[in-house]
Structures are given as structure tokens and as C-alpha cells.
Amino acid sequence: MKLDSWRARALIALGLGMFRLWARTLRFGVEDPEKILSASRDQPFILSVWHNRLLLLPPVFSLCFPHRRSVGLISASRDGDFVAILVERFGHGTVRGSSSRKGIIALRQLVDALAAGTNVLITPDGPRGPLYEINQGIIFVAQKSGAAIVPMHLEFANAWRLKSWDRFFVPKPFSEVRILFGAAQRVGPTAGPEEFEHERLRIQNALMKLVEEK
């Protein structure tokens, strides 16, 4: 079904309405010991969250960053079309691309967005995994932009798990949702592949720390 057909537009409007109603039943709590939300008033960040927790990010970003525009990296696939529409309907921007399609162009657009003062969201193990292993793109963006990576995690009291490669989380209605922020991580220049891999693993471990401390 083409996304510009009347049937598609009707289904999208219905789906968005149901999504908003469902999201309003959830109870959100923020844990921000490093004062990231306060610091974000003065600088843009690269927010990083694992792919299997991304469903609630549009309302979460509206809740946590009402004062700063945010842009998300969304897969250029057909599945990504619907995600992009959802993100944009919540008032956020999108950059389309992935590691296998339009990748480098998308990453440079994210660098430009950060230079313009916009927060950037990257799911570093998406869109295909491996699960909980970050790809090189987020390190590239951090090095080129000079912006810090902020590990972010969403923990759900009650959720369904899909049979996808990442066992995607869908919170059940009325579930509690904890939004956790870790310490900002700067990534400097690297002299070669070994240093680059060291930085990649350091950022990966920072994200996993939030998962393990849930």
C-alpha cells in the first residue's frame, strides 16, 4: 500500500490516535543522576538507546526535551517509513538511512543537525543487529561533531516481547516506564583501528551498564 493513498492516510491517522491513547496510560519516571536534562538546555547531545526500546521515544523526547528540537536516524526501509511518520507527527525530525543504504549521507546529516543545535537520536545496534552491539556510525558522528554521546535506557514494568531479532519491547497499557540517563561520553580522535575499537567498546559498555543496573 502506498503511503500517499487515502487508505494509508486513514490507517496512519487511526494508528497514531491509538498510539497516543495507549501512551497516555503509561506512567513515566525519569532517573537522571548526571543532570543530562539540565545540561541539554545549553548543548545538543547524541542520545543513544538500544533498538528494542525505541517504540516510546517520540513521546519520551517530547517529555524530556521540550526546549530543544530532536532528530532521529530512521532506517531507509519500508518499515522505517511508518516509524518516520510517527516521529514526525510528534513534532520531531528524521534523517533516513542505515549502515547498508544511504549510510554515510545520513551520518553527515546528523553531524550537520548537531552543528545547528539539534539533539540527535541513534539506535546503535539497529536496524538489523547484532543485538546490543553498537556499529561504527555513532562513533563517526561523535568524532565529527564533537558532541557527547548520552546513554539512554527505557525499562518497562510490564511488556510484551516480539519474536524479532532484538526481542522488541511493547509496554503493556498502564505499565510503569523508567527513563534512565547515563553520563555523557566524549569521543576524541583515534589514531587507528585499535583505538577506534577501544572507543566503540567503551561506549557499548556505557550503554550496557544501564541495562545491567535496571
Regions found by a protein language model. Give the residues of each.
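A short, well-structured juxtamembrane/interface segment
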Residues: F19-Q43, L55-L57, S62
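Structural signal for conserved beta-strand scaffold positions within catalytic alpha/beta enzyme cores
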Residues: V30, G72-I74, R96, P151, ...
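Alpha-helix initiation/capping motif
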Residues: S5, D32-P33, S75-S77, S98, ...
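Catalytic core of membrane glycerolipid acyltransferases/transacylases, capturing the structured
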Residues: P44-S100, R161
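Pocket-edge structural micro-motifs
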Residues: V30-D32, V49-H51, I74, A183, ...
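Non-catalytic C-terminal accessory region of glycerolipid acyltransferases
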Residues: M1-T25, L37, H67, R89, ...
